[in-house]
Amino acid sequence: MVYSSGSWRDAYKGMSSDNVKGLVLALSSSIFIGASFIVKKKGLKKAGASGLRAGSGGYSYLLEPLWWIGMITMIVGEIANFAAYAFAPAILVTPLGALSIIISASLAHIILQEKLHTFGILGCALCIVGSVTIVLHAPQEQDIVSVLEVWNLATEPAFLFYAAAVVGAAIVLIVQFIPLYGQSHVMVYIGVCSLIGSLSVMSVKALGIALKLTFSGTNQLGYPQTWVFTVIVLFCVITQMNYLNKALDTFNTAVVSPIYYVMFTSLTILASVIMFKDWDRQSGTQIMTELCGFVTILSGTFLLHTTTDMVDGESKGNLSSEEDSHLLLRIPKHSEDSNGFVQDGIILSLRRQESAKSPRPARQNKQLEDDLEAVPLRRQESSLRS
């Protein structure tokens, strides 16, 4: 496809004033939301120490002031995010959540001692590059003069089909998969958050447009569609927060944040393209550049996820001597504890710090070998008695 110089300049004529306002609001939103992840995680840990953890179905965190501070911080960020959607298209606003990933991963490394690998830092850089690429090629916000226009877009067959598919998938995850895999697979909780979140963003954008028009002198509060969007926003946000709390309480923050960002952003962009037809106002070059930027973000989040697993593996296998490695190879790994391996009721602690500081005495090694050799004999005696 060939473009004239005039059409090329039109395609890259720069950001409108509304897009700039949306950009500033989205950046400030990411800062607040990224910090709120850490504050809420601290509150969840503190509440879980004295009550039933959120990941196990408990709600003791509702009585924890630190969790509420994190929640208020997140609400401030969400308000800024809400306002950003009223001024700019979702394709511009949503990818800037990459900044919240960087903030939450960095603070988790500093405050929560959740180690961030060197390649994780590279992943953060890729997230920034991808976000900047998308921002520079984002579509201009279309001119909407009434909430009825948004309602007409939301009730077109294509978006109704998408909404039905999202709700159906979320119900299947909640009913079938969460009871079985919620505590072991991070994608289950985050899947519910992301699916419902894509609908909440579309409703938030509709409500934001209605309020913006109302404040500018064109009252939209008299339309029932405005209140329908309000109810949808409330329902979706409550659902998102519930399952996001479970994900944060169950899994590492440095893992939850990037995966949630990728899924949420992908589904939100898809919903925006279907409902608001953002790509209809762009050239093929711009669309491909946006997709390349998004793939760059995906690469960054993949690095963050992968290097977190590498750090966990290093911390669990960090033994100082060849004898330690030899002994561990002789232990059938039936189940794994957070600090060691469990075999026939005997917990063999790795004691990473002690082994790193000084070698184990020969007498201690001999005693450990004797204990290991005695395990099969104990099992035989137990079977004979039974």
From Swiss-Prot:
Q: Please give the GO cellular component terms listed in this UniProt entry.
A: early endosome; plasma membrane
Q: Which keywords does the record carry?
A: Cell membrane, Endosome, Ion transport, Magnesium, Membrane, Transmembrane, Transmembrane helix, Transport
This protein's membrane topology, according to the annotation, is: Multi-pass membrane protein
Cite the InterPro entries for this sequence.
Mg_trans_NIPA
**Where is it located?**
Cell membrane; Early endosome
* A Pfam family this chain is assigned to: Mg_trans_NIPA
Where is the chain membrane-spanning? 19-39, 62-82, 83-103, 116-136, 158-178, 190-210, 221-241, 256-276, 284-304
Return the protein name.
Probable magnesium transporter NIPA5
List each coiled-coil range. none
What does the UniProt record say this protein does? Acts as a Mg(2+) transporter. Can also transport other divalent cations such as Fe(2+), Sr(2+), Ba(2+), Mn(2+) and Co(2+) but to a much less extent than Mg(2+).
